[in-house]
Amino acid sequence: MPLVPLRPVLDATVKYGYAQGAFNVNAVAQAEAVIAVHEMFRSPAILQGADLANAFMGGRVDFANGTLEDKKKGARNIAEAVKKFAEQSPIPVVLHLDHGKNFDSCVAAIEGGYTSVMIDGSSLPFEEN
């Protein structure tokens, strides 16, 4: 099944009254494992990547100093891998950017293949957040 947006998965939780976990993954093997466990329970899987993980997956060893280009490359790399797993899976799989640091990081994730993003404005002044 192709990657799906987050909204339908969350709508189902409201409609049927259940909780849905979301799991941060920092490596392709972790993504594969999360999907495999969700398949066992026949439950949708929400995989989350963060800016730092995207920089790391983009080849940046000192990922805390990752550039936007590192994040773009990493978002593409993780999305391509997760898409392959999702296409072979009978369950819905969401790829979500968790705590995007800024607008550009969110755009990089969307362009890379993420199906959901969250921008973290907690470092901004209250009025801007």
PLM feature segments, named:
Residues 30-33, 101-113:
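Catalytic cores of alpha/beta
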Residues 26-60:
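N-terminal low-complexity or amphipathic/hydrophobic leaders
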